[in-house]
Amino acid sequence: MRGLPGHERRWTSDTVSSGKDLSGESSPGTDSGNISGFASEEFVEVILDLQDDDTIILRSVEPATVINIDASDPATGVGIGGVSIETPASLTSTSGTRSPTMRRSTSNKLRQFSQELKAEAVAKAKHFSQELKAELRRFSWSHGHASRTFSPASFFQNAVVGTGNGVDSALAARALRRQRAQLDRTRSSAHKALRGLKFISNNKTNGWNEVENNFAKLAKDGYLYRSDFAQCIGMKDSKEFALELFDALSRRRRLKVDKISKEELYEYWSQITDQSFDSRLQIFFDMVDKNEDGRIGEEEVKEIIMLSASANKLSRLKEQAEEYAALIMEELDPERLGYIELWQLETLLLQKDTYLNYSQALSYTSQALSQNLQGLRKRSPIRRMSTKLVYSLQENWKRIWVLVLWILIMIGLFLWKFYLYKQKSAFQVMGYCLLTAKGAAETLKFNMALILLPVCRNTITFLRSTKLSCFVPFDDNINFHKTVAAAIVTGIILHAGNHLVCDFPKLIHANNTNYQKYLVNDFGPSQPQYIDLVKGVEGVTGIIMVILMAIAFTLATRWFRRSLIKFPKPFDRLTGFNAFWYSHHLLIIVYIVLIIHGTFLYLVHNWYSKTTWMYLAVPVLLYAGERTLRFFRSGLYTVRLLKVAIYPGNVLTLQMSKPPQFRYKSGQYMFVQCPAVSPFEWHPFSITSAPGDDYLSIHIRQLGDWTQELKRVFSEACEQPEAGKSGLLRADENTKTSLPKLLIDGPYGAPAQDYRKYDVLLLVGLGIGATPFISILKDLLKNIVTMEEQADLVSDFSGNSDMSAATSEQPALNKISPKKRKSTLKTTNAYFYWVTREQGSFDWFKGVMNEVAELDQRGVIEMHNYLTSVYEEGDARSALITMVQALNHAKNGVDIVSGTSVRTHFARPNWRKVFSKTLTKHANARIGVFYCGAPILAKELSKLCKEFNQKGTTKFEFHKEHF
């Protein structure tokens, strides 16, 4: 019989009068034919789970009332479509002493079956009854003797009273649980198990051929030594685990060796890659069962937990191995025999999903993907190209019109100068080389002015809040800055190249007649030599600019700024943020020299024709004004450090007082300077406090020399942790050592500050990249609490019949403007995905995660933590970690990895499934995807946004943080 997913059907045993009855055998020791003896006999209620694949799982057997199929005699019970419920008087009379199941009324049973049973239940009942009778008959025969002396009810009674045969009762109880576990293992659960306990990940090795090649490299005298086993099978990162695996496989063969032959290696490999779940389970059991007695004690469980924790780089879990070993024993050994067996370990592995129910909202299946992507008909190549073109225009129209306008301006300036110099007499000698050089020079003047505008951060921050943000992509200001820099490099090559290798040689080699006729008014009566042109004001200033810009542009590239290129000392100082920061200040000299260069021109003599200063005047003044504003504002924003903490992963948290005039939005950042480290360097950091907080906070991870020195300075000011407290270095206002002075400047706009525009948020942070979104989560949480308070206020007001009370509450309601209500209700859901490599990283924002879990009763915010140091679910190295995680959360409500109520997932997220889930849950919504982290994931997320935007009406808009 096919049942509805997620529902259960309940059947009870009955007298077996004919094969037409859907019944199970009565409990051992009862007379199935004696209906009048219900008061003295014990019947069971069998709870079955009917799966979609027509398999049946026996969940429990409890005392219950009697139900018959195909027996609708009014004299004996009430029938429902072939199902009758008998309620003997004897059972009714004893209901007061029976369990809650026994006290269920007939009306409750009628309601339950009317809701759960479908028409197909009656049609398939006869067939199912035969299978169930046979299964229960086998169950009764196999445990008849044990059940006569030990019933489920009598076991617990004996346990309380403490009579006699405690060990026998415990063994009988375990035997009963084992029988149930065997019935519970169906085809569906076995199929799920095939995905678990994999010793070799598919992406780690390409099968036996690669292992064979590794053997050839590592073998000595034709044997592979135990110490090289991990590297040979592709488990180099989990050497301890691999060595235990080697020992377990050797023990099964009664071998105690330190080396194996190629043939033995092949046998080992065949076993650990066996597709049979039972085979893999036995190997895992053997790894734990080191004394080979077929039983696992608590100490052995502790050892394998420590081994798994070490393989997954979970140092804290290793420290708490004893506690979690006791937790597993408590769950699997309720009889307290002191050991567990293979079948109990199997039960825990197969039923771990039951304990993970708390995270079902976090682990969405791929069904959503199939629902959204199935049925998409294949389109012709022309149709696909046109769709992509339309989408690209819709997605990038802001960038396109800005770039097109910029390119058209450069083309116009180039052509204007090109034709202007074509009319000059110098063209007759220098030719088109002169025209190209002058056209490029005009674009250089324009771009040298334009490149300053995207880095006028205060101006950009202001413009973000205006209507202009609807037409100009201010989020791409840094990218546009880099694009203009590339155009400047191109212009320099054209301008300087044509002068040095083309028109200068033509000038010095021109015959005297042409020189006197066309160039004497520009270069004087004496024809210059090449060195005269180079050492002149124009030549010297040009060379100086080229050298300084080459240095600044080179050190600003990603390879140098991110220290991707390694140099030996002392040249290592040429890489990193400091090299970028200081080299960029060379451009101040470049602009001064550029004005001089544009004043002393060979072919232009009228001052109003020398336009370089005209291009630069406004941008240079604007940028200089911003730098001046930063200087004075940093002195105006006096802050007092309130709290300092240094977390695992070399993360420094600074909490400081909030200046009264410092107003910011969630997602924005500010610049920080510490004179004790450097009196000149300013570094940007995302603000992690919410706008409503009465303090400012930032989280700084040690990545470069400045952050390293900053951490050292504050570490010296921090106090050592007291005994019994967390091992964090902390300092506050009461610390005896004075804290270093800190200067701030900002706030400055960032893409994440526009999160309120979207119906749904998808926030993705890698490591310290989570910082821009912590402030957003805090702000959302505050809005949630405010919204609930407003709803309660409105509810109290509407339900209050007292006019005086209503009058007193009316002003409070009037304060809630429609505009404010609309802004708080705009974002309906937020999904935060935090991916990190280290377990200690979760301490950074532990308080925020607990606060969200406690206050977000409506489930507006979903938090997803991913720890990439742990092997993915299904890997044998993380199997026990997953079990402990599930058990501990089911019992205590706390995740063992993060220390919060938010479950930690292992390995990396499947981003396609994440997008599919979000698409399914929020059809026709505008979803903002905000990302902060490594560029490689940004490309994947951007690509997925484009892909899913072409599938339906839901729109994903991707934004990446730039500093």
From Swiss-Prot:
Major subcellular site: membrane
Membrane topology, Cytoplasmic segments: 1-399, 457-482, 557-583, 781-963
Annotated EC: 1.11.1.-, 1.6.3.-
Membrane topology: Multi-pass membrane protein
Region named EF-hand-like 1: 219-227
Function according to Swiss-Prot or TrEMBL: Calcium-dependent NADPH oxidase that generates superoxide. Involved in the rapid and transient phase I oxidative burst induced by pathogen infection.
Protein name, as recorded: Respiratory burst oxidase homolog protein A
Gene transcribed to yield this protein: RBOHA
